[in-house]
């Protein structure tokens, strides 16, 4: 009789054991669903990172395109060495943004103004309006101007008193170098395009070409 | 003294008899089938009661906790992903627009021919092939237009901004530097903007309005009313 009592007690202990067994199964069921959610979250995070990187790349690219190429004004600091009486200085290379051609450096203005203002602007760069010395140079200059639908003052104007075209260095235009289309009247200055040289009013607004001569010591 | 001894003896005897009675009652219960069945049913009911609330608690917790945490996070991720996707698409569109360098027309009524630009009720055309002033006017007329003029501040500002750094012939001309400026329809110009230079044919430069000799070849600008206006008329 006592032993039967003991068995009853054992049974009572076993029942909570069964209850405990049921817990893990429920917890495993709970884990499965979150696992899928975890996978979804991981995919979501990966997508987020990818999109963020793409966004950054595109932003940089768009900004790069939006930024227009800066038109840096050509400013030439006065070369002190050049001013020295010893004259040791030697300019063998063209300054930045200038186009080299034989012993000259050429540059095209970014703005339009009357001829006289172009002359002043060139002198401020220690240069002068372009003087074309031969046919080869004319071809070179017009080749540079291909693709530009613009007109450019050069250092050539009409001297009414002498009835002739003169370069700003005082020399007279030779007919074989270039031919000027248009009127030969007072206040006429020469304009060059990629195909022709015109006579226009010196008071007209146009771009211009400066030249700087390279010095060899 | 023996009487006292007798008095002390009864308590242990009484307790012994009580314990014996208890044992008998327990034996009786175990022997009977009814009490055992009752105890079995009690244990079953106890286990079910204990199990049910546990399962209820678990079931209750799962729906309560999981949707609160995971779906919220997922929703946030989805929203952010959508926002980023839209941003990427917008930037891509901006890139394509920049690359093609297509300038969107300012058409108010979208009634201008292709390659013409609408401003207010007018259409403007920028002729990029240089020609002299007279030929420029002829080319404009062939398209039912005239060399450009401006009647409003809006048109003037548009012309100034759109032309870039090149010079463009437009509709002003005069017989000599001593004569007043006129439009191509011979109406007199009101001198609202001064014109530089001493010549007889006006053009737009990046310095404002200038004048040059008519035989010079330049780009040009044409203008005509848009068809919406003409339809209304």
Curated annotation (Swiss-Prot), chain A:
It is found in: Membrane. GO terms for molecular function: carbohydrate binding; signaling receptor activity. Keywords: Disulfide bond, Lectin, Membrane, Signal-anchor, Transmembrane, Transmembrane helix. One of its GO terms (biological process) is regulation of natural killer cell mediated cytotoxicity. The keyword Membrane applies. Expressed in natural killer cells and a subset of T-cells. InterPro entries: C-type_lectin-like, C-type_lectin-like/link_sf, CTDL_fold, KLR_subfamily_B, NKR-like_CTLD. It is a single-pass type II membrane protein. Residues 1-45 are cytoplasmic. CDD domains: CLECT_NK_receptors_like. Disulfide bonds join 122-210, 189-202. It comes from the Eukaryota. Residues 101-211 form the C-type lectin domain. Residues 67-217 are extracellular. Signal peptide: none annotated. It holds the Pfam family Lectin_C. Its main location: membrane. A motif (LCK-binding motif) lies at residues 31-34. PANTHER family: KILLER CELL LECTIN-LIKE RECEPTOR SUBFAMILY B MEMBER 1, KILLER CELL LECTIN-LIKE RECEPTOR SUBFAMILY B MEMBER 1F. Binds CLEC2I/Clr-g leading to activation of natural killer cells or stimulation of IL-2 production and proliferation of T-cells in response to antigen stimulation. May contribute to the formation of the immunological synapse between T-cells and antigen-presenting dendritic cells. This is Killer cell lectin-like receptor subfamily B member 1F. It comes from Rattus norvegicus. The lineage of its organism: Eukaryota, Metazoa, Chordata, Craniata, Vertebrata.
Swiss-Prot record, chain B:
One of its GO terms (biological process) is negative regulation of osteoclast differentiation. It is found in: Cell membrane. CDD domains: CLECT_NK_receptors_like. Residues 16-29 have a biased composition (Polar residues). It comes from the Eukaryota. Keywords: Cell membrane, Glycoprotein, Lectin, Membrane, Receptor, Signal-anchor, Transmembrane, Transmembrane helix. One of its GO terms (cellular component) is endoplasmic reticulum. Pfam families: Lectin_C (PF00059). Its main location: membrane. Residues 98-233 are extracellular. Residues 119-228 form the C-type lectin domain. Residues 30-50 have a biased composition (Low complexity). Lectin-type cell surface receptor. This is C-type lectin domain family 2 member D5. The gene is Ocil.
């Amino acid at each position: 009789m006592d032993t039967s009592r003991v068995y009853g007690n054992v049974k009572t202990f076993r029942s909570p054991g069964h209850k405990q067994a049921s817990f893990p199964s429920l917890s495993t069921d709970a884990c499965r669903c979150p696992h899928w959610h975890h996978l979804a979250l991981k995919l979501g995070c990966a997508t987020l990172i990818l999109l963020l990187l793409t966004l950054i790349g595109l932003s940089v690219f768009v900004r790069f395109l939006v930024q227009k190429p800066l038109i840096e004004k050509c400013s030439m600091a006065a070369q002190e060495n050049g001013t020295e009486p010893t004259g040791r200085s030697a300019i063998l290379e063209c300054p930045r943004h200038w186009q080299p051609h034989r012993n000259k450096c050429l540059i095209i203005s970014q703005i339009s103004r009357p001829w006289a203002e172009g002359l002043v602007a060139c002198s401020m760069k220690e240069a002068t309006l372009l003087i074309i010395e031969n046919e080869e140079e004319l071809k070179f200059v017009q080749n540079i101007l291909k693709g530009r639908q613009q007109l450019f003052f050069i250092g050539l104007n009409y001297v009414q008193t002498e009835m002739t075209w003169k370069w700003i260095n005082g020399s007279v235009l030779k007919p074989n170098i270039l031919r000027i289309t248009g009127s030969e009247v007072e206040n006429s200055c020469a304009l060059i395009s990629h195909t022709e040289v015109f006579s226009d009013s010196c008071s007209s607004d146009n771009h211009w070409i400066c030249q700087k001569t390279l010095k060899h010591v | 003294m023996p009487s006292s001894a007798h008095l002390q003896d009864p308590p242990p005897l009484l307790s012994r008899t009580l314990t014996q009675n208890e044992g008998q009652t327990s034996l009786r219960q175990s022997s009977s089938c009814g009490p055992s069945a009752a105890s079995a049913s009690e244990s079953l009911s106890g286990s079910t009661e204990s199990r049910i609330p546990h399962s209820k608690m678990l079931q209750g917790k799962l729906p309560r906790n999981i949707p609160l945490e995971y779906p919220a996070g997922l929703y946030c991720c989805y929203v952010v992903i959508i926002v980023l996707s839209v941003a990427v698409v917008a930037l891509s569109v901006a890139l394509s627009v920049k690359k093609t360098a297509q300038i969107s027309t300012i058409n108010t009524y979208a009634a201008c021919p292709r390659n013409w630009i609408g401003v207010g009720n007018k259409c403007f055309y920028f002729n990029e092939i240089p020609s002299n002033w007279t030929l420029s006017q002829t080319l404009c007329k062939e398209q039912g237009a005239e060399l450009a003029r401006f009647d409003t501040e809006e048109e003037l500002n548009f012309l100034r901004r759109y032309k870039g750094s090149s010079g463009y012939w437009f509709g002003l001309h005069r017989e000599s530097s001593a004569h007043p400026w006129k439009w191509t329809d011979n109406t007199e110009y009101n001198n609202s903007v001064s014109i530089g230079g001493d010549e007889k044919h006006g053009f737009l430069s990046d310095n404002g309005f200038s004048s040059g000799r008519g035989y010079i070849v330049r780009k040009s600008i044409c203008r005509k009313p848009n068809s919406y206006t003409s339809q209304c008329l």
